[in-house]
Amino acid sequence: LDWKTSLTVKAHGLGKEEPVYHMEVSGPEYAQIFTARVSLGENGDIIGIGTGSSKRKAQLAAAEAGWKSLDSLKTRTK
């Protein structure tokens, strides 16, 4: 599984909303940097941020950060 799928599975397992990715692009057109922020639900708190040279890389990095955030939350609430 990739990080995006893993995050969706973990969110559903915890009874949370579907992950939503918000994208920003910066830098010149020949060297763009993509930044993804992931939240649970359209208006949820940001649980992960990632950057990359493509939209997919940024989303995967954000999903990994979000997965780790949810995992630490789950561990703290046990």
Regions found by a protein language model. Give the residues of each.
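Double-stranded RNA-binding/processing signature
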Residues: 1-78
